[in-house]
Amino acid sequence: MEEADLTLPLSQDTFHDLWNNVFLSTENESLPPPEGLLSQNMDFWEDPETMQETKNVPTAPTVPAISNYAGEHGFNLEFNDSGTAKSVTSTYSVKLGKLFCQLAKTTPIGVLVKEEPPQGAVIRATAVYKKTEHVGEVVKRCPHHQSEDLSDNKSHLIRVEGSQLAQYFEDPNTRRHSVTVPYERPQLGSEMTTILLSFMCNSSCMGGMNRRPILTILTLETTEGEVLGRRCFEVRVCACPGRDRKTEEGNLEKSGTKQTKKRKSAPAPDTSTAKKSKSASSGEDEDKEIYTLSIRGRNRYLWFKSLNDGLELMDKTGPKIKQEIPAPSSGKRLLKGGSDSD
C-alpha cells in the first residue's frame, strides 16, 4: 500500500511520507560544518584586482625623503629648455630648481639611467608640501576642480598622460597620493625615456595648495617598492610660467647682489670710539692731560681763553671754592626758579 502511494503524483499529502523514507548516508556526517568552509581567511566579497593593487602599494614613510639620490643606476631627470616667453606652457629654472607650468598642461620630463633597472621597475610621482609646517598634510586638488572632474582619481594632483598603464594609489596609513608608470627602455638612438606629467590644480587655489609651495618627488622603484633612485624639484602651477620664472630669477639675482653690497660696504670698527672709552675709564689721567683746541676767530679765542684762565685759577686756589659753588640740579628747575623770583 505504501509503495502504491509513493507512485502517485507528488502532492502535499504524499510529501510527508516521502520525506520520512529519504535515506541519509552516514558519510555526510563526517563532513565539516558549513561554517568551517568560510573560516579559512577567504573573503568572497574582495575584488581580485583590488587585492592585487593593494598588495603592490609599498608602505610609505610618514615624511618622504626629498634629497636627491642617483643610486647604483644613475637615476637622473632632464627638462626641456623652454625659455621665459609668455607663450610657453611649462618651463624649468635650473637656478631655482623649480618647474613652472600651467594647469592641466602636459609637461615632458626625461628620465635617464646609466644602468638599466630590474625588470618591472616603475617610476612613482608624489607631491609633498615644501615647508615643515605643512609637510604633514596631503597635497590634494581644491574642491572646485574636483567637482568638475568625473574620473576615479579626481582628488590626485599629479596625472600621467599618454599611458594606459598608469596606476594611482593612496597610501592606507598616510593618505598620500602617488601615481606610477612602468619604466620603459630608451628607444633606439635615444639616451632617455620621456614621461608626461600634468598638474591638475593651481598653486593659488583656495582649499587646495593655497599658495603653499610644493615639491614633486620622482622615484625609481622595483615592483616590491624598493627605491633605486630619487629626484626632487619644486613646482609652481600658474597662468603664465614664463613670466613667473623670469620674476623669481630676477628676485634671486637682486637678493644676491644686495647681500654682496652689504658685505663690501660694512663699516670698519671705529678706533676713536675705543680710544675714548678707554681714556674715559681713567678720570684722573684726563685731568692732567693737555689738549690742543683750534678756534676760528680772535674774539672767540679770547672768550675761551678767559674761560680757561678762570678754570686754571680755580684749580690753583683749591677744592674749597669748588664746594662753595652749588652745582645746578637741572636746567629746567633753574629756569623755573628764575621765573618765580621775577
UniProtKB/Swiss-Prot annotation:
Positions of the UniProt region annotated as Interaction with DNA: 236-243
Portion annotated as DNA-binding: 68-255
Region (Basic (repression of DNA-binding)): 319-336
Subcellular location, principal: cytoplasm
Keyword list, A-Z: Activator, Apoptosis, Cell cycle, Cytoplasm, DNA-binding, Metal-binding, Nucleus, Phosphoprotein, Transcription, Transcription regulation, Tumor suppressor, Zinc
Comp. bias (Low complexity): 271-282
Record-listed Zn(2+) binding positions: C142, H145, C201, C205
Native source organism of the sequence: Xiphophorus maculatus
Name recorded for this polypeptide: Cellular tumor antigen p53
Domain characteristics, as noted in the entry: The N-terminal and C-terminal disordered regions undergo liquid-liquid phase separation (LLPS) following homotetramerization and activation. Post-translational modifications, such as phosphorylation or lactylation affect the ability to undergo LLPS.
InterPro entries, alphabetized: p53-like_TF_DNA-bd_sf, p53/RUNT-type_TF_DNA-bd_sf, p53_DNA-bd, p53_tetramer_sf, p53_tetrameristn, p53_transactivation_domain, p53_tumour_suppressor
Annotated region described as Disordered, given as residue ranges: 244-287, 318-342
Site, as annotated: Interaction with DNA: K86
